[in-house]
Amino acid sequence: KGALLSHGNVGRLLTATAGEFNFGPHDVWTLFHSYAFDFSVWELFGSLCMGGRLVIVPYDISRDPQQLHRLLCDEGVTVLNQTPTAFRQLLPIACASPRTLALRQVIFGGEALEVASLRPWLERFGDQRPSLVNMYGITETTVHVTCRAIRLADLEGKAPSPIGLPLRDLRWYLLDSQLHPVPVGVAGELYIAGAGLARGYHGRFGLTAERFVPSPFDASQR
C-alpha cells in the first residue's frame, strides 16, 4: 500500500498494548509472516524491542502445520501470531498431540476470526493459557486497532467475531458519508483516530487527502 509509518507509530503500539500482554525477555516469538505483510512488524518489533527471542520460521515449515507444531514445541514458543486460516490448519494437530506447548499468547489478525472455529482448541486447552486474542486493524493504523481476549463463554455468545475495544491511544467512530455519527442499529463506516495513524500514502497525495480526513470531533486529529 505504500503507507508511511514512523518508528514512533510502532513504538506507541508496543506501549499501548503493554498492559494487555506483558511481553518481555521471557518470551519466544515466531516470525511466521513475510516482511511484506504488516503482521510481521508486530512480530519483529514486539519481540526484539521487549528483549525476547525471535525464531524465524522457514517458508516450507510455515506451510506445513505438522512441522510448525514441532517447531513451536522444540523452540518453546510463547507468543504465536496467526491468521485464522493458518491457525485452523494447526489446531487439530495441536489438539491431538501429546506434546506440551509453551504458548501463553495466540494473537489473531489479518482477517475475520470466527469464534466457533476455536471450539476444539478451547475445549482442549481452555481460555487462560494460552490466551487467544483477536486483534483488528489495517496497515494504515499500524497493524492493530482493537484487542479482545476470546473466552469459552464466547462460544455461546451472539457475536460470531468479537473485535473488542480500541487500544488506549486510539478512538473509533461509526459515521455516515457526511461524517455524522449513525444511530444505533444503522450501518455506517468505521473511522479510526489517534496516535496509530500513518502519515499517508507514499507519493499519492490525492488518496491521502481522501482517506485521511480531519476529525469532526477534534481539530488536532485526523
Task: Enumerate the predicted regions with their spans.
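Short aromatic/basic micro-patch
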Residues: 4, 38, 62, 81, ...
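AMP-dependent adenylate-forming
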Residues: 10, 129-134, 148-222
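Conserved pre-ATP/AMP-binding loop-to-beta segment of ANL
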Residues: 23-29, 35, 168-170, 184
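Conserved AMP-binding
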Residues: 33-37, 60, 139, 194
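Conserved AMP-binding/adenylation subdomain of ANL enzymes
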Residues: 2-30, 38-78, 146-148, 152
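Alpha-helix capping/helix-boundary segments
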Residues: 85-87, 113, 197
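Gly/Ser/Thr-rich phosphate-binding loop
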Residues: 49-52, 77-81, 91-162, 171
